[in-house]
Design a protein with these regions (language model features):
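A compositional signature for long Ser/Thr(±Pro)-rich, low-complexity
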Residues: 1-409
Length: 409
């Protein structure tokens, strides 16, 4: 009976709470599992506490059809150590190696995401490698997706003998190889997924970037024969300016492009990606995942720190349930839900946005590099202009994203 009430309430929430409706293109799938939830309740003699009051030991094992991963809280656990460090894993970019770059506090590495409805299993590197045996895993997207890729590599590499692993880095494509498992964990740089004039040689001024929102073939030819594809695209669209968008010939893109609002251009680009997936991917061979947007934290007033400077000096997650700042654009989330909801090929949504929204403490801040050089002392003393509140320290939040990803595998 409790199961039925919960399922009914969940349906009402889906109808009336916009934030939840567009977080997953497969949200309605959880209602098909109501019978399974009821069966579980019956097996435990109906002794279920309300979700908000459940003790950890009574929680269900993680089941994506039942558990809403976006609802939960961060719990501090000093006894749980990260599976790697930026001093040990040799594959991390200096940009995200916060401790090596002088970050003095370490608590940000000891927060664990605890969903309300279930227990999220810890990342098991042996299980991950068994899942990948004889397969290719490819992360596609921007620097935040590269962070998730590096996190995954570092989470598994420590249990692989040195002579059984290798890394080949490139400007566009990088490949980590686990020889013993005949597996690769790869990254492909495509910040917009669709083609742009800023793909290979990055154009810092967004006013000079031009997107070919109807073209993806140049990138997509590198995504074939892959067993697991994990996509993301968000932050590069959010410059605050209109997007220079082009159809047809790209030869003289400086002439004839149209300036579109970011959500409009994003929808066109994501539809191009979705059409490629639907027309190309064999779902019997390849599983497709989409990581939702990674929040930025630029306005401390949004988490009631009136004297703060961006995310600088933040040392704890936001406690307010449902905190949602301006760094996560709900219009973009709605586009993702709309487009993925109409696709023929099933795409598993890695819904990381809400849980990441709380983590104002976990960005690289001033403990990072820019232009290939570490910030100077003078730059560190000016966090208003130099604190990076977009990227995440590693170990850190992207490790939780990969916990969720592995749970889906």
């Amino acid at each position: 009976m409790v199961a039925g009430i919960i399922c009914g309430l969940a349906f009402c929430v889906l109808l009336y709470n916009e934030r939840i409706t567009f977080l997953s293109a497969t949200s309605l799938a959880r209602f098909s599992s109501c019978a399974r939830r009821a069966a579980h309740d019956a097996a435990t003699d109906g002794r279920r506490e309300k979700i908000d009051g459940m003790k950890e030991e009574h929680k269900l094992e993680y089941d994506a059809d039942i558990c809403d991963i976006s609802e939960g809280k961060w719990v501090y656990n000093r006894s749980v150590k990260p599976l790697y460090s930026d001093r040990i894993c040799p594959y991390l970019d200096r940009q995200v190696s916060c401790v090596m770059n002088g970050r003095p506090d370490f608590d940000y590495r000891h927060w664990q995401w605890q969903p309300d409805e279930c227990s999220l299993p810890r990342f098991d590197p042996k299980r991950a490698l068994r899942k990948l045996k004889g397969k290719r895993l490819l992360f596609v997207g921007d620097s935040l997706q590269r962070g998730q890729w590096q996190s995954f590599v570092c989470l598994v590499e420590s249990i692989i003998p040195n002579d059984q692993k290798s890394m080949k880095r490139g400007r566009v494509r990088s490949v980590f190889r686990a020889k013993e498992y005949n597996a690769t964990i790869e990254f492909y740089w495509a910040p917009f997924l669709v083609e742009s004039n800023s793909d290979l040689h990055i154009i810092g001024d967004p006013r000079k970037r031009i997107l070919k929102v109807d073209s993806i073939a140049k990138h997509a030819k590198h995504w074939s024969d892959v067993d697991f594809l994990v996509f993301n695209t968000y932050v590069w669209w959010m410059s605050g300016l209109k997007i220079n968008s082009l159809w047809g010939s790209f030869a003289n893109g400086e002439e004839g492009y149209e300036e579109l609002d970011a959500p409009v251009a994003y929808r066109l680009g994501l539809k191009t990606w979705a059409n490629w997936v639907d027309s190309t991917i064999d779902s019997n061979k390849t599983r497709v995942f989409f990581t939702t947007m990674s929040p930025t934290h630029m306005r401390p007033i949004e988490w009631n720190n009136k004297d703060g400077i961006k995310c600088f000096n933040e040392t704890r997650p936001v406690k307010k349930r449902g905190h949602w700042g301006s760094g996560s654009d709900k219009r973009i989330m709605k586009v993702v839900g709309d487009v993925l909801g109409k696709m023929k090929v099933h795409v598993t949504v890695l819904n990381v946005t809400q849980l990441s929204e709380y983590r104002v403490d976990a960005h690289t801040k001033v403990y990072t590099e820019t232009g290939g050089k570490l910030l100077t002392d003078e730059q560190k003393a000016d966090p208003l202009h130099h604190a990076d509140c977009i990227h995440w320290c590693l170990p850190g939040v992207p490790d939780t994203w990969n916990q969720i990803f592995l749970a889906h595998l």
